[in-house]
Amino acid sequence: MTAKSVLLAAGMCLMPGLAFAQANPVYIEKIDMPMAAAAHEVESVLHDGGYKIVLKLNILKLIGAQQKTLKIPHFNERHFSDIRAIVFCNPFDFSKLINSSWPVAAGCPLTLDIFSKGQTSYVVYGLRADYALTPQSRKIAEALDTSVIKVLQGIPMSRVEKGIPDIGKK
């Protein structure tokens, strides 16, 4: 796999998250664990909730490895120790979306990102319901968001964050 293809894959995973962060609210769960433990717990609750993990990317590592070439100004100013993306899907929800309004199925597989700094991690999931094109697909997308949130609330040592946490640039 070439560096360009790795960066393209990383960008494709991040782009949906960025669109949701700007256009829609995001759901944030704070976990009192470092990345390795937090990622393991997130993957476990997703699996137990009926989701299939399609792809896992260490975004910070992939882009950081290209920093000398890319020369991104102010890269990782908040000094996250790790940022990972998880692409996942519930096959049954995917089938419902295809059958109700097939273009909306582009929102599934779903993505979430885990941001870690020291012993604390944050799971960020962009809500999908506002992107539904029909009342039927909106109902399915709302149920999907509710299901994902319920699953994420099962992460041990976690709690819902109200608003966006102030992660200092220290």
Please provide the spans of the model-predicted regions.
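Bacterial N-terminal signal peptides that target proteins for export
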Residues: 1-7
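N-terminal signal peptide c-region/cleavage motif recognized by signal peptidases
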Residues: 16-18
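Terminal, regulation- and interaction-focused segments at domain boundaries
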Residues: 21-50, 55-60, 161, 165-170
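Stable alpha-helical elements in mature extracytoplasmic
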Residues: 38, 42, 94, 140, ...
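Compact, glycine-rich, soluble single-domain proteins
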Residues: 55-107
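Hydrophobic/aromatic beta-strand elements that line small-molecule binding cavities or substrate pockets
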Residues: 110-114
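A short, structured loop/turn motif at beta-sheet edges
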Residues: 115-121
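C-terminal partner/receptor-binding element of secreted or periplasmic proteins
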Residues: 125-170
